[in-house]
Each structure stands twice: as structure tokens, then as C-alpha cells.
């Protein structure tokens, strides 16, 4: 495979040994596919909006004479595009129009004759739409709906593991979980009776459920027990023998037949005895009559003459009943077969505690349990029970639930409905009893075959259905009110409940989260996050250790590394790199199929359920050139995910990639295999907090995962079609599309507008920079412009920094870092932060607020940065406390004296009835105003500034559209010119004519004439579309804004701050090696090497051994080698050596070991391409060391040698202050360092006086509340230990909550008197009141 033009600019050397069989799939599939299914019409009506409509409609009136039917739906085009919605603070959504049909039937007619049909389209609220990047814009902010991992519907068998009862007895239970509807549980109690619960309410004997289904005692016993038949023959009692049932019992009598004793009394019956009995075909044995005593009758035995029941079903047989049965003429007696070992008498025992006796009494019992306090009637109790599990409206197992149910109970696949049947309930009870009897095992609820993913589409559909059901109730009421002649479907439907349900879900659900937009990786990870929390999921407090732990089914599905630290650990996971969900919502991972020990190219996705039956080899198994395993035994995962050694011919599948275990964030960590898991977790999490730097710098040591993440995140601009760059500037790129990719009759021009300096959710800066030049050939899918944190289409979260591992005067104690001043001077970690501040003018009771520059009691200097409308200029440098938007609010009328009233009447209104409520820059913030936006309510007059902004927007829109039109016209006329010249026209003559005249020419060739006419039509179309677009844009700009009720105007001011790195900022590497900057050191004081090159950061070597993240050391070595090669290339370029020398050196670097995936052949490159490549490699040769398949020690040494560096990776350094040599070589190299979004500027905070808590009167805490620092009990102990009594008294009284004391203190300080007069702290009064509230009077004696 060759490289394209832009790929040749910079090629990453790959150390991977194994070929890439499968590319990393598109990373946002889980979001986009799910939402597509929700919105796109499904002809079968199995999913999405269609399914929701079909499940609720038709709505039939109570009398059955009218019904409202659903026909179909359509989504309108959204009014504003994504960008406009973000600016305006509105939701990016499309209106939903549903075609409904109201059918009324003739009441008089005997057959259902249609009397009237009305059909019209009804508006049903708005559905938020997903942007191309898998996010939603809700009220102007980007949000992500996180997928949820919840328990799959179906049936689960579990046990309490002996924790419930003090005896430690294991109690088994079964639970049928539907997708929606009531849960049904069966459970054993310590006495081995079987109970049922509905919706986790009070338990009832399980046989009540069976009776409610209509079964009699005899039928219930028949369902669950085998029978033993006894025959009465004279005074003898014969038992029908099934030898297998006797295994393990002790014979209580001699088992003999035909005069031969098979088992003597008191002996244990073994398999040998059973064999002998079977061999001689013994079917009956004589038993003593005591043997039947205590056995349980399997049916009612009735005296046929008197009708009296001698022995009821489930009654015990005694000597008395035996005699009566013989007397009544019964020759055979059937009893239940039970034993203590593996056929327990559970159902029989349960029937004894069951208070009910027939179906009605059972239904009454269930009714009383579900609705205590209501008197049951036969109809209501029957209806309640049927609605619980047998009504499709109230109960649905769903296709997933039915599939899991059938698999668990070994029913045929694909059979059964969404509701339960009698057979289903009996099968569950049977399996539970089998498990109690020791046959079968309980399920593992943490197995990923029992947990499924619920994504956006499915959750949105459920919310939509909830809204529809609310509407259904209202419609039913309206339909039953009569007078349907005048009513149309439009009148019946109120869209409010639907839009409220949808809005609530997208706006405030626990799973609808504010998008983490620090950098492209954090966006991608957030969209691939899988949470076990949320509605219908777990809660943090209740989740135990097992749920949070890594399970062997996570392999290739959920990342074992990336999860938050803290209370959510293990509950929030990340999707593995190659994982996807299947139609049922279970996670699948890809494997290569293995046939007879040969690995094929065929790839199959397996879910955790399917995987259980296969043996799967690891991705790093050794293969020969025919893809056969070379080892006699291969490490593979077999039953239950346990790994072992297997023969090649026993293996069914093989892993696709070494990276398939981990998530994309963990796959970005080079040498992950050498890091401790805890540190790797921190590394994966901290990459998401990296702030995009001013100039992105690709990592020298990467993993090859950088490209897919940058492309899929959507922050970079990617070419939709191939072509040539025709125009490029900072804000737009124009591509002339290749002829073979254009559609007939279009201009063949693609225009990409770039995003410039906008604010992200985390206040970081989003800006796109073109990375192509005029005339560059472009292929489809290539990067045209880099976004934040991307460099030539590769993810670049930080900077490559020269580091040394050595102590330096205690400045790197406890993970601190010593940073060189050069890093600050070169702006390596300078970041731009954009803050949005808004000012709202409302209509108050006392009058409306006004935005104006005329503010009472404010000096001229404070207004110097405002224009005449009272709004700050763009470009103004502002600092804390400056006014950004002047605003005055009407004050309440104060009572005026008659004299004042007279003055008022004479001089007119004074400005004293308004107070200043201007928007000011918050304290501690400073920056430059980069943009101002004014939104004015419809019908409110726009101020001068708003009109100026409007005019500017109109100008820009017109300029943009005109430029676009010119580019498209140029493309069209070029085609016209070519057409005319090819038909024999003279080029010089044509150029003299006006271009529009070209279209009026005639050509003899009819086909060409048609083409010309087509182009003329296109030209007209272009002009028309231009006019139309301009008009639409003009209307949008001029139109008033849709603001919240009571709001007249909103002014948004954007401030940009450039933040350089400084002591107190938090930095980190990719291996969980985080630290705080302790000092910025002058360059001349930093340690330097023999060439006089100083290091940029000094790290503490003691941070490595105990943390066990050795990956950082290997990264440092490999980084040094990569930079060494870059330096060599740079020297050759400076010396202007011939291209061949350059080519062979670079070729040598690429050929050095590794490169399992793709060989780089520079002989196919032109000299110009080699030079351009060399130019991009000056700063270092970028290398990729894939996770679990990376560079080893020998390879790093080879690369160091090629770069002309010592293979130890250690260099002699000299002290920058004294010039002395350090006594031993130091590990120096290049590490990729990130600046995290924990900046000291955002954390620094100080308070003198401020707000106090209402009850305790103590200062509030935290920067947001402008709070104080808590002087806690340990600090109090410290002062006590020092005996600093007065200081302690001051801390606990006047500095805290002694209200009078602190007022006095304030006065004293003002008057220059340093005296303290402490009183009683307010919190003491609080505790006194609390004690009084307990009914104990407590008083302070003043003496």
C-alpha cells in the first residue's frame, strides 16, 4: 500500500511486530447508530419512534365506537444549524409531525360500518437531533447521553451465599425481570418452603401463584413430583421398583425378590446393588407396611360410598388411612417420590403453609397483598392478576428478555411472546427446585451475558413512549366525552406531555451529561463511556465489590484499566477499542476464525454468551507465514475465561489485536505493558484533563492510536471527497473535486468553513488551522485542518520535553517538578482560555431594567471601556472589578417627605430611583474581550450596539455567500470555457467576451449543445440559490431572539486569557506520573550536557520505583533516540547534503526492526517529497510502540546507536550554577508531558471578610462562595499544644462566629486600636438550642 501526498509529510515508524488485521472501527458508532435507529423509520416497527407509535396507537374510546389510528410521521428540517443554536442558547431539534386518522363507526349498524374518517397532520413537539459528532445541543450547550449498563431482562437464578440466615444455610431464589412491568421473584426460606414475591412486596407461598393460574392441589403435585405406586395384595404391600431412585439410601428392610436377597437391611444401597436389580429385571418388591407410613398421597382418595375424603392430596398416610383405603376397596396407592438428597419435598411442604384452597381465594390473597385495604371482588382480583403478567400493555419481556429466558430454561429459540405463559412460570419454579436439589448452577449476575447496554436511541424511545402514554390517557377521556363530529385529530392531541418527557430526559436525566470538552480524547471517551448508574441502574451506596470488579467477560468489551478513582470506581467503564453492541444490546468483540490450527482472515464478532463455548488464542501467539501456530502448545482462554495451554488444533478463534483489551485512552499510553495497573488508570484518566496548548506538538513516542482518535473526534476538518486545494485561508478551505467523484451536473466544489477561537464547555479554546497548501492533491478522508490538540491529523495533547531524572536541591521533593524558564519563553505550555459572561436585563415589577452607560455613582474612569450603549468594546483589556455591561435596575419607591415631593415635581425624576446592577469582571480574572453578542426580545427596540453587530453579521454573511458564489461560478465557467474551446472556439476571442455571454453561444454538436444548456441552467440555479440563502440568512439575523419569559435583553461577553505555565500548575506524563511545578528556574542554572544543551524539566527518580510505572523510563529512552535521529537529519539538512544520503539515512531508521504492519519504501518518493519528509522529521522521528506489542530493549538500543547516542540512555550532565560535573551519568530523554486543567490561577483564593452561614454565623467555605479556610479540630490541637491561648481564642471567636465581637473588632481596627473583645460564639447558642429541642433546659450562668 502506497502513501498519499499528505501521508508522506510525516510517517510514524511502527515498532509493532504483528500485522493489523482489522482497523480500529469508527469510535462514535455506539452513539450515532443508536440514535439513527431511533429516528429512522423501521418498516417492521421493532424499534425507534415507529415502535413507540405502534405500541400506543390505535387509541380506542371506552365504548369502542371511535378510534384514533397512526398513519406515519416525518421530522421537519431544524430551523437553525448547530453553530447558530450554540450562539443563541437554543436546542438543536426538529419538529415532529405525525399523520393521524380519526375513524368513527356507526353505532346503529350491527356490523362495524365506518361512519366517518378524518385525517390530518399533528405537531407532536420537538425531538433533539444528534450532531455529526454524537452530541446534542441542549439550550446552547453540548451534551452527551452516556450509555447505560443494566441487568438484561430475562430470568436469573441466584443465591444469598448463606448471608441471610444465621445458620449460614444457602437460600436460592429466581427472579423474572421484564423490560417493563412487574418483577416476579421465587425464593426459598430457611425451612425450605418456596415463596413468591411480586414487585419485591410481601412474600406469599409460591403455590398461590399456581392456584391463581387455575391449578388444583393434585395438578400442582403432578407438575413437580414423580410417583411411587404401592399395591395392596392381601396382607402384603408391594412397591413398584425404580432401582435408580434407591441410590445412596440405607435399606430399612431386606430387599428381596424370587427368594434372593439383593440388599440386606441396614446396608447402604450402591451402584452395584442397582445394577444387580436392573439385570434381573426386578420391578416389584414386598415392603413392610411401616414403609408407606409418612409418605404423601399424590391425589385425593375418596370413599366412593359416603363421599368422605379418606386421604386428601398432599395428606400423609397413616396406619388408620391405610386400613380405610383397603376397606374402601383401593388396591393401588400413589405417593410422592421424595428423598433428603436430591428430590426435596419443597412444593408439598409449601402447600401445607398455603392458606388458599382454590383459584378465587388465591386471587383474593394476591389482591390483598398488592392493594392492602381495598376489598377484593372476583372481577377486580382476576383483572389485577391478569394485568400483572399476561397483558401486553403492562408487561413486556422484550425480544432480549425472551431470548435470555428461552436460553436459560432450554426452550426452543424464537418461541414465546413478550408476556409470560403458565409453562414459563412452572419451568422457572422447576429449575429453581432443581438447583436447590443440587442439579444446575446459579447465574453470575456480573457476567456480561447478563448485563446489556442501553444506548441513547433506546432511552429516548422509552421516554417518548412515556410521553405518548400520558397523551393516550387524555385522548381516551376526550373520546368518551362525545360530540365527535366537530373534533379533528389536531384537537385531541396535546403535545405538551410528550415534549416535557423528552425535554426532561435530554435536559436533566442523570445520564445526559455536560460534555467533557477539554480535548479531543476527552470528547471521544465521554461518548464511549458506559455507566452502571442512572435510572433503572445501580446506586453508588448499594453497589458492592463484585459489581465494580473486573470480570473475565470484560475481555475485549470493557476496558479493565480506564475507570474513575473514587466512589464511582468500577461503576463507570469505557468501551474497549474494538467492541460494539449487537442487536440485543450485548457487547461483542471481534476474533479471527481458526480452522484446523490455521488462522484465517475471516473475522467474527462474539458476545460474552457465545464466547463461553470456544477456546481463544491470544493476539501475540506466534504464527508462521501460512498463519499457522508455530508453538506445540498455545496460551489461550478456555472454559470460564481461564487461561491455559492448548494444542493448536483445539483452538477455535484468535484475538484480532493486542490493543483489543483496552479502551482508546489506555491504548494511547506507550509501554503500557510495563506500567502498574493503578498508575495506568491514572495515566488514562489524566490524558483526558490535558489542556490544548498554543501550538500542538505530536508525541515523539506514540502508539499509533493518535490518528484514529483525532479523525473520529470530529475536531479536525476531514475531506469528504478527493480533489485539489483551490483556495485556503485562516477561515475557509476550498477543494476542487476530482472529476470521477463529482455527481453529474454539479459544480464540483467543496467549501469547508473553519471554526475560529470559540469556547469549549471547559472554557478551553477551539480553533482550526489549515494544514494544506494551495494546489495540494487531497484524497477522501484526509485531514485539511487541525483542530485543538491535533498536529497533522494526529492527537497531540502535550509537548515533547527534555527531562532528566535527578534530585535538584529539594525542588523535586514529593513529585514536584523543576521547570526551565525556556519552557515558559517558548510558550510550550501556554494555553488560551475563553470565558463567557452574560448580563440579563429583565422586566421587574417596579419597571424594566435598562442596559446603559448612564450608571449612578460611577466615575468616568470606570466607564472608559464602554460604548454609548453601555457595552464594552471588543479588544478592551479588562481586569477584576471592571464594568463590562452597564445596567440599572429600578429601586422600590421610598416614602418621600412633602418637601421632597415638591422638589421632585419641580425638577422632574431624579436618577436616585435606580441602582447599579452592572456586569463586572469577577475578581481574580483578567483578559481581553474577543467578542460581544446582544440578543434582544422580539418587539423590543434594538440599541445602537445591537444594530452595529447585526449590520456586521449581515456584511459577513453577504461576503461569505458572495465568495462562495464566485468560487462556484469560476468552477462552472471553467467547464463552459473548456467545452467551447473543445468545440473549436478561439480562446482569445472568448476571453474578450463577458463570461455570461459564453452561455448564449451555440454549438453544432448536439450533445455538447445540451451540455452547454445544462450548464446555463446550473448557472441560473446558482444565482437563485444565492439569493435564497442570503434572504434566509438576513431573516435569521434581523429576527428578534426567543428569550426566556420576562427577559428583555441578553448581552454575552467573551473574555480570552493567555495562561503561561507557573509554579502551582499541575503537570503529568502519560503513565500516572503527576506532579506540581515547584519552581521556574533560569536556563543558565539548569543541568546541561557536553554540547551545552540544558534539560527542560528535572524529575525525581524516587517517583519511579515505588509506583512501578517503568513505562516512563522506556518512553524517555525511546524519546531520546527519536530526537537523536531528528538531530542527525537536521544536521544533514543544514549541511545541504545530497538527497540520496538523506534518503538512505531515513530509510535505515525506518527499516530498523519492527514495522510488522507496513514497510516504508523511500525509493518511491520523489526528491522533493524526501526533503519535505526530512523537514518534518527535524524535531525527531515519531515512533509508534503499540500496547502489548511495542519496542523492546534491544530495539531501543539499536535506535539510540543510529542516533549517535550512548546505548545506556544516560548522559553526563554538568551543574548549571557551578559548571561541575555530576558524579554519575543521568537518565536524560524526551518525555511527552501534559498540562492538566488544574491551574493555580483557578485555585488561588484569599478572603478578609465576606459572607457568613445563616445558622452558625461561621464564614462559608470554598472559592465559589468567597469563603474562608476552615480552622479544624486538628489545627485547634496544634495551638493547644503550643499553649497559644490568645491566638486560639481569637480563632474560635472574633475570626469565626462571635457576631458582636467581630463587629467591635472591625471598629477597633478602623480606629487604629488593636484590642480584641471576644464574646460567645454563635455556634454555642446553636448547640444550646439543639439541646433544648431534646427537652433538656440548659442555661448559662453569667457569674
UniProtKB/Swiss-Prot annotation:
One Pfam family linked to the record: RNA_pol_Rpb2_6
GO molecular function, one term: ribonucleoside binding
Biological-process GO terms, alphabetical: DNA-templated transcription
Reaction catalysis annotation: RNA(n) + a ribonucleoside 5'-triphosphate = RNA(n+1) + diphosphate
Cellular component terms (Gene Ontology): DNA-directed RNA polymerase complex
Keyword terms, alphabetized: DNA-directed RNA polymerase, Nucleotidyltransferase, Transcription, Transferase
Family matches, as InterPro entries: DNA-dir_RNA_pol_bsu_external_1, DNA-dir_RNA_pol_su2, DNA-dir_RNAP_su2_dom, DNA-dir_RNAP_su2_hyb_sf, RNA_pol_bsu_bac, RNA_pol_bsu_CS, RNA_pol_bsu_protrusion, RNA_pol_Rpb2_2
EC number of the protein: 2.7.7.6
UniProt cross-references to PANTHER family, sorted A to Z: DNA-DIRECTED RNA POLYMERASE I SUBUNIT 2
Protein family: Belongs to the RNA polymerase beta chain family.
Subunit structure: The RNAP catalytic core consists of 2 alpha, 1 beta, 1 beta' and 1 omega subunit. When a sigma factor is associated with the core the holoenzyme is formed, which can initiate transcription.
Function recorded in the entry: DNA-dependent RNA polymerase catalyzes the transcription of DNA into RNA using the four ribonucleoside triphosphates as substrates.
NCBIfam families listed in its UniProt record: PRK00405.1, rpoB
Name of the protein this chain belongs to: DNA-directed RNA polymerase subunit beta
Organism the protein comes from: Haemophilus influenzae (strain PittEE)
Phylogenetic classification of the source organism: Bacteria, Pseudomonadati, Pseudomonadota, Gammaproteobacteria, Pasteurellales
